[in-house]
């Protein structure tokens, strides 16, 4: 892996990296986020008793949509033909909802940003739908857990 930043041109100005010479490979990225809240807020999400509707269903769709639109909101991301997006939720304890996003493609560049965007927007959607009853919710940490495929090789958080 190189320490050289590739998103700058010879004038030291931002540019989108040219991936035209890269090989097409299967690429998968997994990101995680979480949102912490009052126990009664999480209980109401679990029971489907939030006024705005089914929080997890809406957050799941928002996460999928966000992954598909990542290239439109992150300036140097390439538009990618995503082949799979999965958003999953887990009730970690009485105050924490974990969100995992898996994004797949077969292409010349990875889908790390799409996975990170997906879980971030899913968490923001949970916040939006529950803020009337709990303004003290905290989002994060958000992190890339793994990525496979591509020239830089595989990454799995916690492995050296």
Swiss-Prot record:
What this protein catalyses is: (8S)-3',8-cyclo-7,8-dihydroguanosine 5'-triphosphate = cyclic pyranopterin phosphate + diphosphate
Record-listed E.C. numbers: 4.6.1.17
GO terms, biological process: Mo-molybdopterin cofactor biosynthetic process
Give the quaternary structure: Homohexamer; trimer of dimers.
Q: In which pathway does it act?
A: Cofactor biosynthesis; molybdopterin biosynthesis
Q: Which residues bind substrate?
A: 76-78, 113-114
Which organism does this record belong to?
Answer: Brevibacillus brevis (strain 47 / JCM 6285 / NBRC 100599)
Q: Active site located where?
A: 128
Name of the gene: moaC
Say yes or no: keyword Lyase present. yes
Q: Which UniProt keywords are listed?
A: Lyase, Molybdenum cofactor biosynthesis
Q: What is this protein called?
A: Cyclic pyranopterin monophosphate synthase
- Protein function: Catalyzes the conversion of (8S)-3',8-cyclo-7,8-dihydroguanosine 5'-triphosphate to cyclic pyranopterin monophosphate (cPMP).
PANTHER family for the chain: CYCLIC PYRANOPTERIN MONOPHOSPHATE SYNTHASE (PTHR22960:SF29), MOLYBDOPTERIN COFACTOR SYNTHESIS PROTEIN A (PTHR22960)
- One Pfam family matching this protein: MoaC
Q: Which family does it belong to?
A: Belongs to the MoaC family.
One GO molecular-function annotation for this sequence? cyclic pyranopterin monophosphate synthase activity
